[in-house]
């Protein structure tokens, strides 16, 4: 028969008393009033903060965007199909933040920095807020280091510096993404970490870009953030901030690439494209019943982009001179750069590269319209060698454009005008460049020097591209001294000019034979 021992009972009671926790847990809880279209209205949550993360019963995360008198309007970061009216919502007390660190290199993540490439979890070295304040005036330094894109037309006429924000703008299918990807490919071995943010794109397009970067060895220094077209508007809205936060970690903290012991603190960010982010934000704002403004965008759509792009900077020496360069992409409709979003982003950035569909269809690729493309601060970052040859190129091309328009109406042209037109055609031809084939500064300087100094005048226009390719191959293999001279001095020295002239004359002689 079972006997009850008083000492056992007393020890159990004593244990229970000792384990008893008097600590109270206070949770801010609300109730779902209405849910649908990626938006939830929640009653309660009196102490909710703006942009606070909310957790729904089914595990879906939301962000509180509208704080109204009697309810909170939240956007859902998932489908939210199992959220029911009347279910409870818990305020987490946290603002949206993501893990950051070197482990993200070579990975594809979503807008919440969760890996989507099937290569396992990523362990971040620290956590950063998605919305961080941009560096102030004292924390910045003016742009002075070049960020070479490898595209001759850009590096010569619209140079980009580290810490600059240069807009790439044009109609669909004019080569905007190609310029961005070429720039990423050209950073190989140059100590720059790249972040490519794909907003509202097809998953197949993103997969194609990942494959291009992987096959050319660029994925090891690149992070890809993807919020595809089928994902909720909230994730498409957040993706650029996620990419920016990952880039900011590099700018402020620096990191070492695999197989290298050198710490790098320069980052390049591509937002492809901010038009789709603005559309996602408009969708969210209209569903939250915010008043619509021009083109039905909310009144704070300028602030949406300005607070993102102002985070790109060149830091002062006190902060380590890190840099975050931004290449936002904007898609125009029928070349209309005076629409709301294009004008907003043009006014925020330090210059724009305008791509023209007419030029693209005529065979000029990259289809850069040099007339309305500009770099407001990049000139200070251009290397001396490029500056020396680019001035003449820009002037000759401007005169050629004027003459070309005039020559359409004139029947008889004098010899000097004909020679100028012929030179202009050859200059335009050397600026053509195939996809995914960036050139080094030395190669760009060589071909511009050859064209502006008349070395290509006796070559047929159709033969310019083959000549350019063969000459650059010859220069790399037989006159490697020239490349080394440009690389070490960053200037077109007398020695470099002599080597280049000799190489051009020797090569033309062998070609004629």
UniProtKB/Swiss-Prot annotation:
F-type ATPases have 2 components, CF(1) - the catalytic core - and CF(0) - the membrane proton channel. CF(1) has five subunits: alpha(3), beta(3), gamma(1), delta(1), epsilon(1). CF(0) has four main subunits: a(1), b(1), b'(1) and c(9-12). It catalyses: ATP + H2O + 4 H(+)(in) = ADP + phosphate + 5 H(+)(out). GO terms for biological process: proton motive force-driven ATP synthesis. InterPro entries: ATP_synth_asu-like_sf (IPR023366), ATP_synth_asu_C (IPR000793), ATP_synth_asu_C_sf (IPR038376), ATP_synth_F1_a_nt-bd_dom (IPR033732), ATP_synth_F1_asu (IPR005294), ATPase_a/bsu_AS (IPR020003), ATPase_F1/V1/A1_a/bsu_N (IPR004100), ATPase_F1/V1/A1_a/bsu_N_sf (IPR036121). It is found in: Cell inner membrane. It is a peripheral membrane protein. It is an enzyme of class 7 (translocase). The gene is atpA. Produces ATP from ADP in the presence of a proton gradient across the membrane. The alpha chain is a regulatory subunit. Pfam families: ATP-synt_ab, ATP-synt_ab_C, ATP-synt_ab_N. GO terms for cellular component: plasma membrane; proton-transporting ATP synthase complex. Its EC number is 7.1.2.2. ATP binds at residues 170-177. GO terms for molecular function: ADP binding; ATP binding; proton-transporting ATP synthase activity, rotational mechanism. The keyword Zinc-finger does not apply. Transmembrane segments: none annotated. Belongs to the ATPase alpha/beta chains family. Keywords: ATP synthesis, ATP-binding, Cell inner membrane, Cell membrane, CF(1), Hydrogen ion transport, Ion transport, Membrane, Nucleotide-binding, Translocase, Transport. This is ATP synthase subunit alpha.
């Amino acid at each position: 028969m079972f006997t009850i021992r008083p000492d056992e009972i007393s020890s159990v009671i004593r244990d229970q008393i000792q384990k008893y926790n008097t600590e109270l847990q206070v949770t801010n809880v609300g109730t779902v009033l209405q849910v649908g279209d990626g938006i939830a209205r929640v009653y309660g949550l009196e102490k909710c903060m703006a942009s606070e993360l909310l957790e729904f019963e089914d595990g879906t995360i939301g962000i509180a965007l509208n704080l109204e008198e009697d309810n909170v309007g939240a956007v859902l970061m998932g489908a939210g199909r199992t959220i029911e009216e009347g279910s409870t919502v818990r305020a987490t007390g946290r603002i949206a933040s993501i893990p950051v660190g070197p482990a993200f290199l070579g990975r594809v993540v979503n807008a919440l920095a969760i890996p989507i490439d099937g290569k396992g979890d990523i362990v971040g070295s620290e956590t950063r807020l998605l919305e961080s304040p941009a560096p102030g005036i004292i924390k910045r330094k003016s742009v002075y280091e070049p960020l070479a894109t490898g595209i001759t037309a850009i590096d010569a006429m619209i140079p980009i510096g580290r810490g600059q924000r240069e807009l790439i703008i044009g109609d669909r299918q004019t080569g905007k993404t190609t310029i961005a990807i070429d720039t990423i490919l050209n950073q190989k071995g140059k100590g720059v970490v790249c972040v490519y943010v794909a907003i509202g794109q097809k998953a197949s397009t993103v997969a194609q870009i990942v494959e291009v970067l992987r096959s050319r060895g660029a994925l090891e220094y690149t992070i890809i953030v993807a919020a595809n077209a089928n994902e909720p508007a909230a994730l498409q809205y957040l993706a650029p901030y996620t990419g920016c936060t990952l880039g900011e970690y590099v700018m402020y903290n620096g990191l070492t690439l695999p197989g290298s012991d050198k710490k790098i603190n320069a980052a390049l960010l591509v937002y492809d494209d901010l038009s789709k982010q603005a559309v996602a934000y408009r969708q969210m704002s209209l569903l939250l019943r915010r008043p619509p403004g021009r083109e039905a965008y909310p009144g704070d759509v300028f602030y949406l982009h300005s607070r993102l792009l102002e985070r790109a900077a060149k830091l002062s020496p006190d902060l380590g001179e890190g840099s975050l360069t931004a290449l936002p992409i904007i898609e125009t409709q029928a070349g209309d750069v005076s629409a709301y979003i294009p004008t907003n982003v043009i006014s925020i950035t330090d210059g724009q590269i305008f791509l023209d569909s007419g030029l693209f269809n005529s065979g000029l690729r990259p289809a850069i319209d040099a007339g309305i493309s500009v770099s407001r601060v990049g000139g200070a970052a251009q290397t001396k060698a490029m500056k020396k040859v680019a001035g003449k190129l820009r002037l000759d091309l401007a005169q050629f454009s004027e003459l070309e328009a005039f020559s359409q109406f004139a029947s008889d042209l004098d010899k000097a005008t004909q020679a100028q037109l012929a030179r202009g055609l050859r200059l335009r031809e050397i600026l053509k460049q195939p996809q995914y084939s960036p050139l080094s500064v030395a190669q760009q300087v060589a071909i511009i020097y050859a064209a502006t100094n008349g070395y290509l005048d006796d070559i047929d226009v159709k033969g310019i591209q083959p000549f350019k390719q063969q000459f650059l191959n010859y220069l790399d293999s037989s006159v490697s001294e020239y490349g080394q001279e440009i690389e070490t001095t960053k200037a077109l020295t007398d020695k470099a000019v002599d080597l280049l002239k000799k190489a051009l004359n020797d090569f033309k002689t062998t070609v004629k034979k």
